[in-house]
Swiss-Prot record:
It comes from the Bacteria. InterPro entries: Hexapep, Hexapep_transf_CS, LpxD, Trimer_LpxA-like_sf, UDP_GlcNAc_AcTrfase_non-rep. The gene is lpxD. Gene3D superfamilies: Hexapeptide repeat proteins (2.160.10.10), MurE/MurF, N-terminal domain (3.40.1390.10). Keywords: Acyltransferase, Lipid A biosynthesis, Lipid biosynthesis, Lipid metabolism, Repeat, Transferase. Its EC number is 2.3.1.191. It is an enzyme of class 2 (transferase). This is UDP-3-O-acylglucosamine N-acyltransferase.
Length: 355
C-alpha cells in the first residue's frame, strides 16, 4: 500500500503546519531511516549531527527542520516542520491507521464474561478472556486473548490491552491507554511483618489507578497499594520489565526505560525520566524534571530538577579492579589527606614565625 505525500500532509494539517516542497504526487511505500531509505521511502532528519547523511540518502522524501531546508531541497522533495521527530511520530500513527486497521469490534465466543460486568458498545474481547463481576469495559476498548479483568476493575474508553494482561480487582485503567502483553496491574505489593523469625503477610488493601494516555510495556508489573492506591498519572510511558512497587506515585508524562525499578512509597515527579536498569529506593522523592541515567541507584531524594548519574564507569577489568580497590580505601585516604594538609599548615606557620 502507498500514501501520496500531499495526502499525508493534508491529513496531519490539523495537528502540525508543514511545508511540502517538491513533488507532492510522490507515492510513499515505506517509512525508513536515512541510511536504509529508497526512492519511494519517507525518512526524517531530527538532529544536525546527521546532516552529513542527508546528501547521501536515497530517500524519496525527508522530513527536516527549517535549518536544513536548503540542503534537503538540493536532493529532492522534503517536508519542513519545526519538530521533525514529532512530525515523524505522527506519520507513524497515520501509517498504522491506514495500513493496519484494527478488526471490527467483536466478542469471541470463548470469552468468559460475568453477567454483572458492564460491557460498553463497540468493544472487542478476545478468545478466553475473563471479565469478572462488576468490571466495566469502556466504549471502544480492546481486550485481547487470555486477558483477565478482575472484579470491579475499570478499563477506560478506547484503551487497548494486549494478550495475557491482568488487571486485578478494583484497579482502574484510564482512557486511550496501551498495555502490552504479560503486564500485571494490581498484584499484591511486597509487604510482610517480621514476627518470631517468620514473615507475616500484610494484606494489600489499596488498588492501582492509571490515568489517561498511559503506555505500559510487556511484562511490566505495577503493584497495588497497601492501604492507599498506587498511582500512575496521565501520559506516563513505562518500558518492558519495569517494576513499580506498592504506594508509588508517578507524575504525569514521566517515562521509564526497560528494567527500571521503583521501590515502595517513592514519589516520581512530572516530566521525569528514569534510564534503563536504574533503581529508585523506597520512600524517596524525585522533583519534577529529574532525569536519572541508566543503571543508576538513587539513594536519596532529588529535590531539584536536573540530570543525575550514580554508577561506576565501565573499564577493562584490571583497571576497574584497581579503581574499586582504591574506592574502598577512599575514607582512609581522605583522613591521610586531612592530616597532610594540617601538617603543611603547621609547617607554613612555623616558617612564617622565623625572623
Amino acid at each position: 500500500m502507498t500514501l501520496r505525500l500531499a495526502d499525508m500532509t493534508e491529513l496531519l494539517a490539523d495537528k502540525v503546519q508543514a511545508e511540502l516542497l517538491g513533488n507532492s504526487e510522490l507515492l510513499i511505500e515505506r517509512l525508513s531511516t536515512l541510511e536504509a531509505a529508497g526512492p519511494n521511502d519517507l525518512a526524517f532528519l531530527s538532529h544536525p549531527k546527521y546532516l552529513g547523511q542527508l546528501a547521501q540518502s536515497a530517500a524519496g522524501c525527508v522530513i527536516v527542520a527549517p535549518s536544513a531546508r536548503e540542503a534537503a531541497l538540493k536532493r529532492g522533495p522534503c517536508i519542513v516542520v519545526d519538530d521533525p521527530y514529532y512530525y515523524f511520530a505522527l506519520v507513524t500513527q497515520l501509517w498504522k491507521r491506514q495500513h493496519f486497521p484494527g478488526a471490527a469490534p467483536a466478542i469471541h465466543a470463548s470469552a468468559c464474561i460475568d453477567p454483572a460486568a458492564i460491557i460498553s458498545p463497540h468493544v472487542s474481547i478476545g478468545a478466553f478472556a475473563c471479565i469478572a463481576a462488576g468490571a466495566v469495559i469502556g466504549e471502544g476498548a480492546r481486550i485481547a486473548e487470555h486477558c483477565v479483568i478482575g472484579a470491579n476493575a475499570i478499563v477506560g474508553a478506547n484503551s487497548r490491552l494486549s494478550a495475557r494482561v491482568t488487571v486485578a480487582d478494583d484497579c482502574r485503567i484510564g482512557e486511550r491507554c496501551i498495555i502490552h502483553p504479560g503486564a500485571v496491574i494490581g498484584a499484591d505489593g511486597f509487604g510482610f511483618a517480621p514476627h518470631d523469625g517468620q514473615w507475616v503477610k500484610i494484606e494489600q488493601l489499596g488498588a492501582v489507578r492509571i490515568g489517561n494516555d498511559v503506555e505500559i510495556g510487556a511484562n511490566t508489573c505495577i503493584d497495588r497499594g497497601a492501604l492507599q492506591d498506587t498511582v500512575i498519572e496521565d501520559g506516563v510511558k513505562l518500558d518492558n520489565l519495569v517494576q513499580i512497587a506498592h504506594n508509588v506515585r508517578v507524575g504525569r508524562h514521566s517515562a521509564m526505560a526497560g528494567c527500571a525499578g521503583v521501590a515502595g512509597s517513592a514519589t516520581i515527579g512530572a516530566h521525569c525520566t528514569v534510564g534503563g536498569g536504574a533503581i529508585v529506593l523506597g520512600h524517596l522523592r524525585l522533583a519534577d524534571g529529574v532525569h536519572v541515567s541508566a543503571a543508576s541507584i538513587v539513594t536519596r531524594s532529588l529535590l531539584k530538577p536536573g540530570h543525575y548519574t550514580g554508577l561506576f564507569p565501565i573499564d577493562d577489568n584490571a583497571a576497574w579492579e584497581k579503581n574499586a580497590a582504591t574506592l574502598k580505601q577512599l575514607h582512609a585516604l581522605r583522613e591521610r589527606l586531612k592530616q597532610t594538609e594540617k601538617s603543611l599548615l603547621q609547617l607554613q606557620g612555623s616558617l612564617e614565625e622565623k625572623p
